[in-house]
Amino acid sequence: MEMERKFVHTITFGCQMNEFDSELMTGLLEGMGYEPAKSLREADLVLINTCCVRESAENRVWGLLGSLKRYKRDKPELIVAVSGCLPQQEGTAEEIIRRFPVVDLVLGTHNRHELPGLIEEVRAGRRPVLGVRQPDSAVPEGLPVRRKSGLRAWVPVIHGCNNFCTYCVVPYVRGRECSRRPDAVVDEVCGLAAAGYREVTLLGQNVNSYGRDLGEGIDFAALLARLDGVEGLWRIRFTTSHPRDFTDRLIEVVARAAKVCEHIHLPAQAGSNRVLQRMNRGYTREDYLDLVARIRAAVPDVSLTTDLMVGFPGETEEDFADTLDLVRRVGYDQAFTFVYNPRRGTPAAGWPDQVPEDVKSRRIQELIQVQKEIGLARNRAEEGKVLEVLVEGPSATRPDLLSGRSRTNKTVVFPGEPGLAGQLVRVRVEVGHLTYLAGRVED
């Protein structure tokens, strides 16, 4: 007798670590017989993997949960599961259950591996199921992962964060830093390369802290050096790096390791020493600029991207001018810019000197405009150069063109045959646009 097919629709908010968590949970569900749904309406299970780092992501989750009421009305047996960082906040899991009766299951960031058992509880009629756990030191290994790409893979190397920036909820919802064993990371990457994956991105809230908790004398630079020797692997990327912990040894490995790409995401957050100190970032603007100079001296073609925040409590016009000055001095290839939002449970949320919303709005628009000009100039400087591009497939916006990534993590589009997907090609850049490069394959 043929088993009834079951479908899951997964919706992910937030960072790359959340993307990986969704791939992992989807892999676990696949082991239960669930297949990816083509649409939300086809789903027997809706899995919403949430983020609470920024207010906008949290608000989108609330809106989505409200919209599911009609789907549950049409399909009462539909299971709605909410996971991720949002339920991990104190009291929020209970709030989700109270505000949204459509939700059958809530779990957090530390017990994703328990998802199949929790789903079975729901199917047995015990709903709602509240499955949020507090963090412990264990990092489960060997769990199935259903990756979106067969070419590039996320590989977490460290979970959690010990930094406690005054605006950030991550240490509270992800827990303290917990590194994976180096052999486990190397074995996973070797397995991916053997399966045909050509690029891995090593993930962590702060990859530069890797190994400190292991007591094995290994750090992130040493891990990178080991992974550079994996046969069949073409490229290694990593994110995110805390500027305070970016060592000269790591710079040396990035410069010398053939497979480590020349792209570094280096969140500055602000350019004012006063603001950086209040943020508890652990470095000054002078420290940051010195680090950038050392990176560029060792890796001349490096592309640098960053995160920047405006409107942090107490930020003055002079502080904001310092941030604009930092952006101009560094010359980022790209910047992810954000308006400060108070996050529940963080020190900065309770400070009295909150910046008015209209001031935040003006500053973010000015920052975006400055970075647009710099980013466009950086991309136009690529015109005439020949770049190595890993072809991903048809462009999402121009299906008649192929799209891929350079080693410096720039999107490159060009004419070509679909059969080039998964290959490395040399592309001469003809035009540098704001968000991508356009060119032609060199014969």
From Swiss-Prot:
- List where the protein spans the membrane: none
- What does the cofactor section's free text say about binding? Binds 2 [4Fe-4S] clusters. One cluster is coordinated with 3 cysteines and an exchangeable S-adenosyl-L-methionine.
Q: What does this protein do?
A: Catalyzes the methylthiolation of N6-(dimethylallyl)adenosine (i(6)A), leading to the formation of 2-methylthio-N6-(dimethylallyl)adenosine (ms(2)i(6)A) at position 37 in tRNAs that read codons beginning with uridine.
Q: Which cofactor does it need?
A: [4Fe-4S] cluster
**According to the UniProt entry, where is the signal peptide?**
none
Q: Does the keyword Iron apply?
A: yes
Q: What class of enzyme is it?
A: transferase
- Which gene underlies this protein? miaB
Q: Name one GO molecular function term.
A: N6-isopentenyladenosine methylthiotransferase activity
Record keywords:
4Fe-4S, Cytoplasm, Iron, Iron-sulfur, Metal-binding, S-adenosyl-L-methionine, Transferase, tRNA processing
This entry's Enzyme Commission designation comes to 2.8.4.3
Which parts of the sequence belong to the Radical SAM core domain? 147-377
Task: Report the source organism.
Answer: Desulforudis audaxviator (strain MP104C)
- Residues noted as binding [4Fe-4S] cluster 1 in the record, renumbered to the chain: 15, 51, 85
Indicate where this protein resides in the cell.
Answer: Cytoplasm
Please give the name of this protein: tRNA-2-methylthio-N(6)-dimethylallyladenosine synthase
Q: Which ranges carry the MTTase N-terminal domain?
A: 6-124
What PROSITE patterns would the database entry show?
A: MTTASE_N (PS51449), MTTASE_RADICAL (PS01278), RADICAL_SAM (PS51918), TRAM (PS50926)
Q: Could you tell me which NCBIfam families the record lists for this protein?
A: miaB-methiolase (TIGR01574), MiaB/RimO family radical SAM methylthiotransferase (TIGR00089)
The TRAM domain is annotated at 380-443
**What does the sequence similarity comment in the record state about its family?**
Belongs to the methylthiotransferase family. MiaB subfamily.
Residues that coordinate or bind [4Fe-4S] cluster 2: 161, 165, 168
